[in-house]
């Protein structure tokens, strides 16, 4: 049925006469018959009747009032849709090639769900099914999630770990194909994470940072390209020496990723460089850039004479720049020391760090001297016998706390007798000590020579004309650009909530790290996309997904009839514009 009308003219005015009619077929001819004649109607009345007819003919439509509409629930969806679309753009389903579960929830789908959760609202694997029910995940993925439970997740974690190498290969091939030049420099680094519990064989007590002390740990390694995208990662026992973790990665770069003999440079932090690792990289026909630890500088053979006699001017508080050093920026001056043996060394000098090193050392020495005076004063007034070992340990521990143990010889405890008069007027002899400790002035002098000094090391030794083919600026910049790999660990720990681990088997620990790397990969790509349109780097910020939060699917109900309808919240103009600019305008749901 529909609202029909006919027109007539009277005294040059046009009048409409309305009726309710319906169409029917007479053989092959379409005809119309009038059911009710209504006559003259206002425009508002005509619109109301059209609405009534529309409702009558459609079971999913109802006439109601705004005040009778209630919101039954809302479920977040847009941030999930963004992460899901980025997963699809990189075709990450194809990264799973080995022993994939053949079910409505295959291995790659579970991995996708876990990755999206890490990107948008990280929680434990036990809580993921509850998170899925509370969000619009089902609408975004368009799949049945009724079989998603913690048993299913733990089952698939084993299979996710079995696919680690194929995932690494997929990320490498995808990023290398897109930008081969992004592998001219690759970065390698490690960090630690800790456990709740003691059951995992991979975990061990190690040298992690403060938050890891007293907890079993694992060592996490990652290789990233020059754009910050990860392509290989590992989990090592927590007590593994960093210097021993590089071999497998270099072998993979040479054999699996075929990066040998392609002018690829591995950049890694001080502490990882060793003669064996340097030889390993050269055998793979690759280059490396690193820096020396403070205790490696003097034995390296670089000339430290330019730093002799340097001091902070008492009037200007400035430091003279050593002769022959060129400016890199306000915080670094450098001198290319050339090749010593088979390695190239570039000596750096930071005047700000020089002043800090000098000030910190002087302050620590003064603090210890004050402590020693007080300790001797207390020993001279001892009320009870003092023990030799306990007294000596207390002095050494204070030196260790101040990190100046190397500046002093072992403390000498000279026995003394303290005469103590008791309340009954008798006298008692108390055994105590006077502490003497000598400063190693030669050690302090040698250490002062390294204040503000850093040394970059590389095997970029090829000559070009009168200089080197690779300029010192390039080597320094590559090393100082390590912040991109520090971003990986900051994102994985602080935003993807990697730590602490709540799983126990080796395979599950490695799979959780793999999921976090996949989530970081997606976050890094989204961050780069937003940077490409002129926005800030939101990688390690809650602002990365903020424009897509609170864009929900709402279930609306008519309180009179009980009928419900599900609608996606209308996009704010700024969010809609952002999605269009990063080519994600299609992810917003229009129909459910």
Where is each model-derived feature located?
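Conserved glycine(s) in the ABC-transporter nucleotide-binding domain "signature"
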Residues: 1-109
């Amino acid at each position: 049925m529909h609202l029909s009308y006919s027109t007539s003219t009277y005294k040059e005015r046009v009048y409409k006469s309305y009726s309710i009619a319906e169409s029917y077929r007479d053989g092959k001819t379409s005809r119309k018959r009038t059911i009710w004649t209504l006559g003259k109607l206002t425009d508002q009345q005509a619109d109301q009747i059209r609405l009534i007819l529309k409702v009558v003919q459609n079971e999913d439509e109802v006439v109601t009032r705004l005040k009778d509409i209630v919101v039954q629930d809302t479920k977040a969806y847009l941030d999930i849709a963004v992460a899901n679309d980025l997963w699809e753009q990189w075709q990450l389903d194809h990264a799973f090639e080995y022993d994939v579960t053949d079910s409505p929830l295959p291995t790659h789908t579970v991995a996708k769900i876990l990755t999206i959760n890490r990107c948008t609202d990280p929680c434990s694997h036990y809580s993921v099914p509850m998170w899925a029910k509370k969000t619009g995940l089902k609408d975004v993925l368009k799949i049945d999630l009724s079989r998603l439970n913690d048993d299913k997740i733990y089952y698939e974690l084993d299979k996710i770990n079995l696919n680690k190498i194929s995932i690494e290969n997929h990320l490498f091939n995808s990023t290398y194909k897109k930008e081969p030049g992004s592998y001219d420099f690759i970065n390698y680094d490690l960090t630690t994470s800790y456990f709740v519990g003691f059951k995992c064989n991979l975990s061990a007590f190690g040298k992690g940072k403060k938050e890891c002390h007293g907890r079993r740990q694992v060592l996490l390694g990652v290789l990233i390209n020059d754009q910050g995208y990860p392509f290989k990662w590992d989990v090592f026992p927590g007590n593994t020496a960093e210097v021993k973790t590089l071999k497998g990665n270099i072998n993979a770069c040479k054999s699996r990723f075929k990066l040998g003999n392609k002018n690829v440079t591995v950049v890694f932090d001080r502490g990882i460089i060793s003669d064996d690792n340097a030889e390993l990289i050269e055998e793979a026909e690759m280059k490396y850039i690193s820096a020396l630890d403070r205790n490696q500088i003097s034995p390296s053979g670089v000339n430290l004479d330019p730093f002799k006699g340097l001091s902070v001017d008492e009037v200007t508080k400035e430091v003279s720049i050593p002769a022959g050093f060129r400016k890199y920026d306000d915080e670094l001056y450098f001198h290319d020391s050339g090749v010593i043996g088979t390695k190239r060394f570039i000596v750096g000098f930071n005047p700000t760090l020089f002043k800090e090193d000098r000030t910190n050392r002087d302050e620590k020495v003064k603090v210890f001297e004050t402590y020693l005076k007080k300790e001797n004063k207390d020993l001279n007034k001892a009320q009870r016998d003092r023990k030799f070992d306990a007294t000596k340990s207390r002095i050494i521990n204070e030196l260790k706390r101040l990190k100046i143990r190397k500046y002093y010889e072992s403390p000498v405890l000279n026995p003394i007798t303290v005469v103590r008069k008791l309340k009954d007027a008798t006298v008692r002899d108390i055994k105590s000590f006077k502490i003497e400790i000598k400063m190693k002035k030669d050690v302090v002098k040698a250490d002062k020579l390294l204040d503000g000094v850093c040394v970059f090391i590389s095997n970029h030794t090829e000559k070009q004309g009168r200089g080197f083919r690779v300029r010192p600026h390039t080597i320094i910049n590559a090393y100082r650009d390590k912040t991109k790999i520090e971003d990986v660990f900051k994102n994985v720990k602080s935003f993807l909530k990697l730590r602490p681990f709540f799983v126990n088997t080796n395979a599950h620990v490695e799979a959780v790290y793999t999921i976090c790397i996949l989530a970081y990969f997606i976050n890094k790509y989204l961050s780069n996309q937003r940077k490409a349109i002129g926005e800030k780097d939101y990688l390690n910020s809650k602002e990365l997904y903020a424009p897509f939060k609170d864009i929900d699917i709402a279930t609306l109900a008519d309180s009179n009839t009980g009928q419900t309808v599900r609608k996606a919240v209308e996009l704010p103009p700024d969010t809609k514009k952002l999605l269009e600019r990063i080519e994600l305008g299609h992810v917003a749901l229009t129909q459910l």
